[in-house]
A protein has these predicted regions:
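C-terminal and inter-domain tail/linker signature
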Residues: 1-319
């Protein structure tokens, strides 16, 4: 049993798995009102919404476009306590068919595979605050488009890139940022990636057999490929700030140590790289990364950023 939650839930992992199954697998959409607070704020890389109704509306729209969408839990990395609030970092793999009209355009009837990570603040049987990053670029590519083209379509429909400020998390919740161990090691590594890339020795950090799941549904195998990804991403930015917002490690018997880090990089699109030639526009990259450590080296990574949202910032008309 977990304090403040219904007696049926043995721990936070169990709670997240059960309510996900009920709402999205079981299509019990009205249960969102039961498990989300009325003032729950949800931030994605391209939007901020407040309230359970917005979650319901988004769920209905997604299911209209992808009626058979599954939400398969790959991992849930937990932090917090009953004294304040919990946070679940939930990595989801979704197979689905693009069978309905919506923001992704005319149905392509193609089978799509995409990942999402949702960081949810939970207390008293409800989700009260959430950060969610979905690999929209993977969806764009698999329906026959690409991230830049989809970004332009969304800009044409909306008139530009507008993102409201995310309300502060409830005062009783303090984000966990571990100061030692594997979570701290990985957070420091990310900071170095964005601030001093040339000083990094990948061999001190990554296992030789590192496998990374990258945005766009891509994969990197080995140190060279993953460092090329980092260079193309971080190397695009003339950095103004980099912040680790959450970092935690979960030790599991018989399994690699699992780490979740939510991070945010801001700067100017000042250099050639992942997003083409520099445009001088301001960029914000919200990322959530899951990592597995074995023998003090990273053996697996899952990086979630939204390349469509980043292209929207680049392509949005200047004022």
């Amino acid at each position: 049993m977990i304090k403040g939650f219904d007696a049926e839930f043995s721990n936070l992992d169990h709670y997240i798995r059960v309510i996900t199954d009920r709402i999205w697998e079981g299509r019990r959409i009205d249960d969102i009102n039961r498990y989300y607070s009325s003032d729950c704020a949800v931030e994605t890389p391209s939007s901020v919404s407040v309230g359970a109704k917005a979650v319901i509306d988004g769920t209905i729209a997604t299911l209209n476009a992808f009626p058979d969408r599954r939400l398969l839990a790959e991992d849930i990395i937990i932090s917090g306590s009953s004294e304040g609030a919990y946070l679940s970092s939930h990595r989801i793999f979704s197979p689905m068919t693009h069978a309905g009209a919506g923001v992704f355009g005319t149905p392509s009837h193609r089978i799509i595979y995409a990942r999402t990570i949702a960081d949810c603040v939970c207390i008293n049987n409800k989700i009260v605050h959430e950060w969610l990053v979905r690999d929209q670029a993977a969806i764009a590519r698999q329906i026959g488009s690409n991230e830049k083209e989809l970004a332009q379509k969304w800009l044409d429909a909306s008139g530009g890139y507008f993102k409201a400020a995310m309300p502060a998390a409830p005062s009783y919740y303090v984000s966990q940022i571990e100061q030692k161990g594997h979570a701290a090691k990985y957070a420091d590594f990310l900071d170095q990636i964005f601030r001093s890339f040339q000083k990094i020795n990948a061999d001190h950090f990554y296992a030789q057999q590192i496998i990374s799941a990258l945005p766009g549904g891509e994969s990197a195998v080995g140190q060279n490929q993953i460092m090329q990804f980092w260079q193309s991403l971080a190397g695009s930015l003339e950095l103004s700030s980099f912040q680790v917002e959450h970092s935690v490690a979960n030790e599991r018997e018989g399994r690699p140590t699992a780490v979740a880090v939510r991070w945010r990089a801001k700067g100017i699109h000042g250099f050639s790289g992942r997003y083409g030639q520099p445009t001088g526009c301001s960029l914000e990259i919200l990322g959530i990364t899951h990592v597995e450590f074995q023998d003090d080296r990273v053996v697996r990574e899952w990086h979630l950023i939204d390349d469509v949202a980043i292209w929207m910032q680049i392509l949005s008309p200047r004022k």
